[in-house]
Each structure stands twice: as structure tokens, then as C-alpha cells.
Amino acid sequence: VQQHEFTAEASPSTLAGSFTPDLVSSKTWLCNYLKKELDGRSAGDIYILGSWYGNMGVFLQQANIDFDRLIMVETRPRLLTTARRLLEPLYREGRLKLVLGRAEQIVYPNRPITVINTSANDMSRVWFQRVPRGTLTVIQSRDAVKDVKVITDTAAQFYAKFPLENTVYWGQRRLRDPETRYTRYMKIGYK
């Protein structure tokens, strides 16, 4: 499935920047296909790796995706503080857990969970190796980036670098930022 949609990208590292049209489009795309795969089932605990400001939680709720808890994994404490404020009702209900640390160090429970990583370029693939076999996993990456840990300049590179036992969706979406056009890739399946 290929989607060719152009959206301007101007995403500063701020809470407002995390809601720019390109990022909203990417997260909405993710939620639409995740919801389709879940088909009314609960996602269990959802681990959001590199959670940034935590707004993935907003999109998951807007899409009415059923989950037990959101576990936000982030290396910057101030971003987790913002995520807590943004998702305060979930926090008060005990459905939001904030983890200060690296995705590559997470120890996952021995039960059904969902793992989402929309920053796969920015982490070594150790995070992926640690995800338990059979886990519902959602990965987004992009081409045309420099100084990243994982280069995915083609759809084939992206697909090969994150092998899933059962891929239920994979596609790409064209975006545009001030300097260049680029492609965001997404893969959903069971590791």
C-alpha cells in the first residue's frame, strides 16, 4: 500500500512543533492502521519508545484505541513532564507510566503488549532486538535524514532493517519540508 501525500514539515522541538501537519498526518496514519489491525481488541500496555512530548497518547485516544496503559519511554525528563501534563487524566487513573531511560534498555513483561516507535532512525536497532517475539509492533522511519543511527533511504532498506514474523501493513507517505521532499515509512506486524 503506497500513499503519496505531500505535507509541509516544519517541526521544531517544542510541544507545538510536535503537532505540525506532517507529524499529525503520520500519527493519524499510524492510528488508523493500528486500529484496523486490533479490530476492537485491546492493545494491552502500549510502549511508546522515544515518546517526545507524549502526544502519541492523544492520537491513540482520539482514534478510540483500547489499551490498558501507555508507557512513555524518553531520555529527556522535561519531555516526560510535558507528557504527564498533556495526558493528566490518564496519569490520575494510573494508566500512564513515564519511564526515563533508553528504549534499548527496556525489559518487557511476559504478556501481550504493543510497541510503537516513530523514531526508529534515532535509535540503534537494539531496541528492536529486545522486543519479545510475537509482539504487535508499529515502526515509522524516514529517508533523507543525516546523522542518524539507522539509515532508511529506501523502502527496501526500511523493510529489511525491521523484520517481522507477520507483517500486516506496510506503506509509505510522501512529505515535504522546507529543504527537501522525503518519504515516511511505516510497518505494522508481529515480531
Show which residues each predicted segment covers.
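Conserved SAM-binding motif I beta-strand of class I
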Residues: 68-74
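Conserved SAM-binding loop of SAM-dependent methyltransferases across substrates and taxa
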Residues: 53-66
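S-adenosyl-L-methionine
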Residues: 1-41, 75-112
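Conserved class I S-adenosyl-L-methionine
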Residues: 41-54
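Short SAM/SAH-binding signature in class I
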Residues: 110-120
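C-terminal substrate-binding/active-site "lid" region of AdoMet-derived donor-dependent transferases
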Residues: 123-190
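Short acidic, S/G/P-rich loop/turn micro-motifs used as interaction or catalytic elements
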Residues: 53-56, 76-78, 103-106, 119-124, ...
